[in-house]
Swiss-Prot record:
Stretches that traverse the bilayer: 13-33
Membrane topology term: Single-pass type II membrane protein
InterPro entries: SPC3 (IPR007653)
Key words, A-Z: Endoplasmic reticulum, Glycoprotein, Membrane, Signal-anchor, Transmembrane, Transmembrane helix
Coiled-coil zones: none
Gene Ontology CC terms: signal peptidase complex
Lineage, broadest ranks: Eukaryota, Metazoa, Ecdysozoa, Nematoda, Chromadorea
Keyword Endoplasmic reticulum in annotation: yes
Annotated source species: Caenorhabditis elegans
GO BP terms in the entry: IRE1-mediated unfolded protein response; protein targeting to ER; signal peptide processing
Name of the featured protein: Signal peptidase complex subunit 3
Residues of this chain annotated as glycosylated in UniProt: N141
Length: 180
């Protein structure tokens, strides 16, 4: 009859085929789901400071500091095919030099076992909001939007943008205090 190695090979090949079919079924069962959730985002206490930037030709840069409040419930997103979320806050604006400027200000990894309902109040930006030049002062249209990557157990990585955006006009004068 068949020896032990050929039987083990057949068993392993069948097991891998079944696992591939289950993985494909897992992906297909969640591919058409809507992963957008309502968010409530407010941006407060925006200050712009002019700093020296030796990395640019102008040697001037605008540094913005701000606080924000975020309320979002991600529990609807976590189905059995979602492993974790990578959530981040982006500021978008136009300047004379660049048509699109996007700056990530804050991020967080949300896992299934973590708290999936975020109610953050008075959060400071985690990363510097630095513009190469003086384009932030008196800017009328800086848009803040929450985005998140849905990291699945199987399937493709989704980029989801919150439907709610906040447009904030920036101050008309520089702040002169040392602390924000």
């Amino acid at each position: 009859m068949h020896n032990l190695l050929s039987r083990a090979n057949a068993l392993l090949a069948f097991t891998l085929w079944v696992m591939a079919a289950v993985t494909a079924a897992c992906f297909l069962s969640t591919v058409f789901l809507d992963y957008t959730v309502p968010t409530k985002l407010t941006v407060n206490d925006v200050k712009v400071r002019n700093v020296v930037d030796y990395a640019t030709d102008e040697q001037q840069a605008d540094l913005a500091t701000l606080n924000f409040n975020l309320k979002v419930d991600f529990s609807k997103i976590f189905n059995w095919n979602v492993k974790q979320l990578f959530v981040y806050l982006v500021a978008e604006y136009k300047s004379k030099v660049n048509e699109v400027n996007q700056v990530v200000l804050w991020d967080r990894i949300v896992e299934r076992a973590d708290r999936v309902v975020m109610d953050e109040i008075g959060v400071k930006s985690k990363y510097y909001f630095l513009d190469d030049g003086t384009n932030l002062l008196n800017h009328k249209n800086v848009t803040f939007v929450l985005r998140y990557n849905v990291i699945p157990n199987s399937g493709y990585l989704r980029l989801v943008q919150s439907s709610d955006q906040v447009v904030v006009p920036f101050p008309t004068t520089y702040t002169t205090t040392r602390r924000s």
